[in-house]
C-alpha cells in the first residue's frame, strides 16, 4: 500500500529526528505544528466531524502516533478556521484535539487575521477572540495557544495585541512543564540585558 509506505517513511524521519535531538542536545524540545485536521469521520469514525484535507490520509502524517510514541515533545495543530466554519469548525477541532492529546503538551495554533475578521456567532458585535480563548481554557489538556502570524500581533491588527496584553496574558506565565524530559527547575537568569534589533523586537 503506497499510503502506508509514505506514512512509514515520514514516521522514520520523525523518530530519527527525535532520537538525534535527544542524543545531541537532550534539553531541546522537538514539536510539530501539523495541519488542523487529523482525520475526518468519513475516513475514520474516531476522526473529527469535519470535511477537509487530512494529516493521516492526505499528508501521510500520523501525528497521534508520534505523540503516543513520544517522538514529539509538543503539538501545535494549526486550527486557523473560524468558529462556525462549515467544513472545519474551530470549536469542533479544539474539542477533538483536546481529547486526543496523547499525553503530550498541546497548544492551539490560531490565526490572528481569521480571528479578528469573523464575528462571534453568539455576539456579532465582537470578534471571535474572547470565545476562542474561553474554548481553549476550558480544557486542561490545552496548555495555551500560538498566534500566527507574529507580525500581525506586533502590528496590533484589530487591536489583537492590546487584547492579549490587557485581557488574556496580563500576568507573566510559567514555562510549561515537560516532566517527561526532566523535572529540574531552570537555573537563575544571569547577566540579562535588553537588546533591540533594527526591527525593534
Stretches found by the model and what they are:
Residues 1-13, 85-91, 158, 163-165:
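Active-site cleft segment of glycoside hydrolase catalytic domains centered on the general acid/base Glu
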Residues 27-51, 79, 93-132:
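Active-site clefts of carbohydrate-active enzymes
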Residues 52-69, 90-94, 124-138:
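Short, acidic/polar
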Residues 77, 147-150:
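Conserved beta-strand positions
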Residues 159-201:
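Pro/Thr/Ser/Gly-rich low-complexity, intrinsically disordered linker/stalk tracts
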Amino acid at each position: 500500500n503506497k499510503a502506508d509506505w509514505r506514512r512509514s517513511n515520514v514516521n522514520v524521519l520523525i523518530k530519527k529526528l527525535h532520537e538525534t535531538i535527544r542524543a545531541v542536545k537532550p534539553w531541546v524540545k522537538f514539536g510539530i505544528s501539523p495541519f488542523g485536521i487529523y482525520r475526518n469521520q468519513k475516513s475514520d469514525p474516531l476522526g473529527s466531524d469535519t470535511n477537509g484535507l487530512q494529516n493521516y490520509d492526505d499528508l501521510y502524517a500520523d501525528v497521534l502516533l508520534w505523540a503516543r510514541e513520544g517522538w514529539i515533545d509538543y503539538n501545535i495543530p494549526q486550527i486557523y478556521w473560524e468558529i462556525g466554519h462549515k467544513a472545519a469548525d474551530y470549536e469542533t477541532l479544539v474539542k477533538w484535539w483536546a481529547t486526543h492529546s496523547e499525553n503530550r503538551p498541546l497548544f492551539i495554533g490560531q490565526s490572528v487575521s481569521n480571528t479578528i475578521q469573523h464575528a462571534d456567532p453568539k455576539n456579532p458585535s465582537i470578534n471571535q477572540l474572547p470565545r476562542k480563548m474561553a474554548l481553549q481554557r476550558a480544557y486542561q489538556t490545552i496548555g495555551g495557544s500560538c498566534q500566527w502570524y507574529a507580525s500581525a500581533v506586533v502590528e496590533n491588527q484589530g487591536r489583537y495585541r492590546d487584547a492579549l496584553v490587557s485581557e488574556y496574558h496580563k500576568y507573566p506565565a510559567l514555562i510549561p512543564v515537560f516532566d517527561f524530559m526532566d523535572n529540574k527547575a531552570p537555573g537563575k537568569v544571569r547577566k540579562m540585558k535588553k537588546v533591540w534589533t533594527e526591527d525593534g523586537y
